[in-house]
């Protein structure tokens, strides 16, 4: 019995030893397997498939402009045409009597006296850009504000830029834009027991992809810059806008000269026929002359300012569009690069996970 017990204990002991030896040998054989020299191909494909999302170049916002305009009064044209025949016919046409009655009713006697006494020298000074004397201006402003008198005056419309009326005293405003560049971390946690060759291959795949992403970003940035340069080169020079205005307003002033001089000559020639209407009609002519020259001065100054404002706004629109496009390029690049960094980490992890035991 004792011998059998010893034999049984020996057998169990030997079996346990064999089992332990087998486990040790198995573990050692796993440890001795070579580590991979390339990352997992599926993860390589995942990295290579990362691309920058398409970036569409946004053009600058359009800057709409309208020119100043001068609309001649139909009633004034009718009256001026009728004045020429009074001296010869000895009669006053209804249109002239109607105009005199409208002015007489709308303008107080004191203002009539002030406006009828305006000299040709004063009118010439205003035509040249000078200020209207204070007393005359006060009387003129009251008269021009009356609808009955307005019917015999030209209508001036100021220019607009970007939907805003330009008066000639517009301060240009700058537009600034900033582009935020997202910081991208390339730090990868070190993974123990990974093959140096496998990591090197993983980094090579990543670096190739990053170079491709960099090239795409450079192309997108260049497209934004090219669009900006094209837009800026298409903006007319301020001088090209302002230079023609000299001739434009010289012609308008010449037309007023002709009208005023002819009207004064006709009224003077018909003074005997006109009687009490003479000073009233002369006042109307002076009102028309002062209003026309001062109005032309105002709209010309406004148009000159509008040229600068339009140029400034177009440049600002081009700059804003460029900055928007560069920002879109940077955002698309940052998104793709972040995905590439995640894929790079997965590649290096695959170098560890494919190979030896833990």
Language model regions located:
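Small/flexible residues
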Residues: 10-11, 32, 219, 316, ...
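A periodicity- and composition-biased signal for non-globular, repetitive helical segments
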Residues: 11-15, 36-37, 223, 259, ...
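C-terminal motif of bacterial Sec signal peptides marking the signal peptidase cleavage site
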Residues: 23-27
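C-terminal amphipathic alpha-helix
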Residues: 307, 312-358
């Amino acid at each position: 019995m004792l011998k059998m017990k010893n034999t049984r204990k020996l057998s169990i002991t030997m079996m346990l030893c064999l089992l332990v030896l087998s486990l040790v040998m198995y573990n050692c054989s796993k440890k001795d397997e070579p580590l991979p020299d390339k990352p997992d191909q599926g993860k390589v494909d995942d990295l290579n498939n990362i691309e920058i999302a398409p970036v569409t170049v946004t053009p600058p916002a359009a800057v709409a402009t309208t020119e100043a305009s001068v609309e001649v009064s139909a009633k004034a044209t009718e009256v001026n045409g009728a004045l020429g025949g009074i001296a010869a016919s000895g009669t006053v046409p209804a249109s002239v009597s109607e105009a005199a009655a409208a002015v007489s009713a709308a303008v107080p006697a004191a203002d009539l006296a002030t406006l009828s006494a305006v000299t040709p020298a004063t009118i010439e000074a205003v035509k040249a850009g000078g200020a209207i004397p204070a007393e005359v201006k006060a009387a003129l402003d009251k008269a021009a504000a009356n609808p009955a008198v307005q019917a015999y005056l030209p209508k001036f419309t100021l220019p607009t830029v970007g939907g805003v009326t330009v008066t000639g005293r517009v301060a240009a405003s700058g537009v600034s834009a900033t582009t935020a560049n997202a910081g991208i971390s390339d730090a990868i946690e070190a993974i123990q027991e990974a093959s140096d060759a496998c990591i090197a291959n993983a980094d090579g795949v990543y670096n190739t992809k990053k170079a491709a992403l960099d090239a795409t970003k450079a192309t997108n940035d260049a497209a934004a810059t090219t669009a900006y340069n094209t837009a800026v080169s298409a903006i007319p020079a301020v001088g090209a806008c302002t230079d023609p205005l000299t001739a434009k307003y010289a012609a308008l002033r010449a037309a007023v000269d002709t009208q005023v001089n002819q009207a004064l000559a006709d009224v003077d020639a018909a003074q005997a026929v006109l009687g009490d209407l003479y000073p009233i009609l002369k006042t109307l002519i002076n009102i028309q002359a002062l209003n026309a020259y001062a109005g032309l001065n105002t709209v010309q100054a406004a148009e000159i300012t509008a040229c600068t404002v339009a140029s400034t706004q177009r440049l600002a629109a081009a700059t804003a569009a460029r900055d928007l496009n560069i920002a879109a390029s940077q955002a698309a690049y940052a998104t793709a690069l972040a995905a590439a960094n995640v894929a790079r980490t997965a590649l290096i992890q695959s170098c560890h996970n494919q190979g030896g035991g833990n």
